[in-house]
Regions:
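Terminal, low-structured helical/coil segments at or just beyond the last alpha-helical repeat
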Residues: 172-231
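Short coil turns that delineate tetratricopeptide repeat
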Residues: 56, 90, 123-124, 157, ...
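Register position in tetratricopeptide repeats
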Residues: 37-38, 71-72, 105-106, 138-139, ...
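N-terminal leader/linker segments that initiate helical-solenoid repeat arrays
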Residues: 18-64, 80
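Canonical tetratricopeptide repeat
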Residues: 64, 98-101, 131, 165, ...
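Residue-level recognition of tetratricopeptide repeat
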Residues: 33, 67, 101, 134-135, ...
C-alpha cells in the first residue's frame, strides 16, 4: 500500500509539473522576441499560436498576432484574426481599423466601408470619416460619400495627419488632412454636377495648402469644363 501511495504521488506530481510546463508561455515569449529581432515573422507567428493555444480563446496575444500579420501585409490572415478578436470585444478601435484596412487592401471596398462606418461612430476621428468618404466615392455611392466627407469637416482635426497624393510617376505630395477633405468634397460635388460648390471646395483646399497641386489642377479643370482628377 505504501509503495502504491508513493507511485501515485509521483504520478500526480509529474502530471502537475507537466501541466505547469505546457501552460508556461515564458519560453514561447522568448522565442517570439528572438524571432522578431531577427526578422523571422513565421517563427514569431508560430510562437504566438503556441501562446494563444495555452491561454485559450480570450488570449490577449491575439492582438499581437493581428499586428504581426498587418505589419507583414498578410491582410487575409489579419482580417481573420481581427474578426475573431472583435467577436469577443467589439470596442477595440485599433483592431477595427486594421480589419477595415485589410478589407480595403483585399479589394473588398464595400465591406471595408461598412467597417469604417462602425469605426467612425466609435472614434469620432476625422481621418476615419475621410477614409469612409473615399471608399464610398470609389464605389460611386456619392450621397453616402458626401455625408461622410461633411462629417469629416465637422470633426476635430489634430493637424498631424497627412495624406499622400501621386502628382506624377516621380513625385508624391504630402497634403494636410483638412485640405484633402476639401478636395474630396469637391470631387464628390463634381460627380453630383454641383460645379459652383465644387469650385468653392477646391478653392478651400488651396487656401488650406497653397501648394496643393491636385486641388489646383481640379479647380482649373472645373473652370475650363474638363474632367477632374480623381483621388
Amino acid at each position: 500500500m505504501k509503495k502504491y501511495f508513493i507511485t501515485l504521488s509521483a504520478l500526480l506530481a509529474f502530471i502537475s509539473f507537466y501541466a505547469q510546463e505546457t501552460n508556461d508561455i515564458s519560453l514561447d515569449k522568448k522565442v517570439m522576441q528572438q524571432a522578431l529581432r531577427y526578422g523571422d515573422n513565421t517563427i514569431a507567428a508560430n510562437s504566438l499560436y503556441n501562446i494563444i493555444a495555452k491561454e485559450g480563446a480570450n488570449s490577449v496575444h491575439k492582438d499581437s498576432l493581428a499586428y504581426l500579420y498587418f505589419n507583414g501585409r498578410n491582410y487575409s490572415s489579419c482580417f481573420m484574426v481581427c474578426s475573431d478578436i472583435l467577436s469577443r470585444d467589439g470596442n477595440k478601435q485599433e483592431i477595427i481599423e486594421m480589419q477595415a484596412i485589410s478589407l480595403e487592401k483585399l479589394g473588398a471596398i464595400e465591406k471595408a466601408a461598412q467597417v469604417y462606418a462602425k469605426l467612425v461612430v466609435k472614434s469620432n476621428n476625422n481621418y476615419h470619416a475621410y477614409k469612409l468618404a473615399n471608399l464610398y466615392f470609389a464605389v460611386k455611392k456619392y450621397d453616402e460619400s458626401y455625408r461622410a466627407v461633411k462629417k469629416a469637416q465637422e470633426l476635430n482635426d489634430t493637424g498631424e495627419i497627412k495624406v499622400t497624393y501621386a502628382v506624377n510617376k516621380n513625385y508624391n505630395q504630402q497634403v494636410a488632412l483638412l485640405a484633402a477633405i476639401s478636395n474630396l468634397k469637391g470631387l464628390i460635388e463634381f460627380e453630383q454636377d454641383k460645379m459652383e460648390l465644387a469650385k468653392t471646395s477646391f478653392k478651400k483646399a488651396i487656401e488650406l495648402q497653397a501648394d496643393f497641386v491636385l486641388a489646383k489642377e481640379n479647380l482649373q479643370a472645373v473652370i475650363e469644363g474638363k474632367q477632374v482628377k480623381k483621388e
